[in-house]
């Protein structure tokens, strides 16, 4: 038997919560921000992942709600819904409840469209109502908005302490580009090209969470500006930023040597979420190591395409050829390295 799987999952969950605190604090959530990470944050992927993880920290969850109350207009709702569906990332009920809550404010009416897109058609029965925060009992009347979506939690009291994303750090680079280029795909395309210098439409579409046709149209429009060039290599047309260094005026933080890294966060978060769910299956600790390895191998098979999209599949020690203890040890080591 391998009862350490439970302890490993608890340790992994705490690392993920620390990571989420770090990322959300960099975006403006009240907390201790550490803004020296070299990558830009993907707010849609981060929010979706948080619906799955932040329910294990009620303070973090409510600080995210507070941030959305102030900054919800910076979330690309169409992209959020697409990533949720295509990457199977995040909790639908929690996402619908958040959207419902925000849509009751005049500044966030558009969130109602997201709520309708992700909510379940039928109302939850009493048997299908679940506690939002597993470790916190409900002592007073539950919040009616979350209860409507089958989630029981206490009343919500937002502190109003969240700030808008600061433009002088790598973490918020995508927000800076959205302020310059708008809330549609153009900002993501520019962010990706600045980080990677060149790419073709299919690759950029996979990395940014948009359809290829949309990306192709954006690239064609950007090319007309004279700042983006293209060249045909084989069957693919590759696009790049001309005079790349001239865009360094966007690097407005101290000691900025390079543009922030673009990480394809959504499939990476999906993979971590899947492994965490597998480790949390009831009774898994009490099963034989062979049974545990079979469960983990099934999870590995399931997320291998996502790991490939995230550019991590070749860094994995765990493979289908491993068995028993060897597979478990390799996969747990991989999970440690997947969390930045």
Residues covered by each model-derived region:
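Long, low-complexity, charge-rich intrinsically disordered regions
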Residues: 1-168, 252-340
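Short alpha-helical segments that sit at the start of domains
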Residues: 160-188
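Short, cationic-aromatic polyanion-contact patches
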Residues: 175-186, 200, 232-255
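Short amphipathic alpha-helical elements of helix-turn-helix/winged-helix folds
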Residues: 188-196
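Short acidic, hydrophobic short linear motifs in intrinsically disordered regions
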Residues: 197-208
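Catalytic or ion-translocation cores adjacent to nucleophile or general acid/base/metal-coordination motifs
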Residues: 204, 217, 226, 242-245, ...
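Short amphipathic alpha-helical interaction segments
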Residues: 209-224
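A short, conserved structural fragment
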Residues: 223-234
């Amino acid at each position: 038997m391998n009862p350490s799987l439970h302890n490993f999952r608890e340790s992994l969950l705490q690392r993920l919560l620390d990571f989420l605190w770090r990322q959300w604090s960099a975006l403006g959530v009240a907390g201790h921000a550490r803004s020296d990470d070299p990558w830009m944050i993907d707010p849609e992927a981060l929010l979706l992942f948080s619906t799955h993880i932040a329910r294990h920290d009620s303070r973090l969850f409510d600080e995210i709600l507070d941030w959305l109350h102030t900054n919800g207009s910076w979330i690309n709702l169409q992209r959020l819904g697409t990533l949720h569906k295509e990457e199977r990332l995040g909790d639908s009920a929690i996402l619908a409840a958040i959207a419902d809550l925000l849509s009751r404010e005049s500044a966030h009416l558009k969130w109602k469209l997201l709520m309708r897109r992700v909510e379940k058609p039928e109302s939850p029965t009493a048997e299908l109502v679940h506690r939002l925060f597993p470790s916190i009992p409900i002592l007073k009347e539950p919040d009616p908005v979350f209860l409507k979506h089958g989630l029981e939690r206490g009343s919500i009291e937002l502190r109003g302490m969240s700030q808008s994303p600061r433009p002088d750090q790598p973490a918020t680079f995508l927000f800076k580009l959205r302020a310059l280029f708008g809330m549609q795909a153009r900002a993501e395309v520019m962010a990706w090209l600045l980080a990677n210098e060149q790419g073709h439409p299919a690759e950029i579409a996979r990395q940014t969470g948009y359809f290829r046709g949309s990306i192709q149209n954006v690239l064609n429009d950007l090319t007309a500006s004279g700042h983006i060039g293209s060249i045909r290599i084989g069957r693919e047309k590759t696009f790049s930023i001309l005079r790349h260094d001239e865009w360094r005026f966007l690097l407005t933080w101290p000691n900025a040597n390079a543009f922030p890294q673009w990480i394809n966060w959504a499939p990476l978060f999906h993979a971590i979420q899947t492994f965490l769910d597998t480790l949390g299956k009831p009774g898994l600790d009490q099963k034989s190591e062979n049974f545990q390895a079979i469960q983990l191998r099934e999870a590995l098979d399931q997320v291998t395409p996502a790991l490939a999209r995230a550019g991590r599949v070749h860094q994995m020690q765990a493979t289908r050829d491993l068995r028993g203890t060897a597979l478990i040890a390799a996969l747990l080591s991989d999970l440690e390295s997947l969390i930045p």
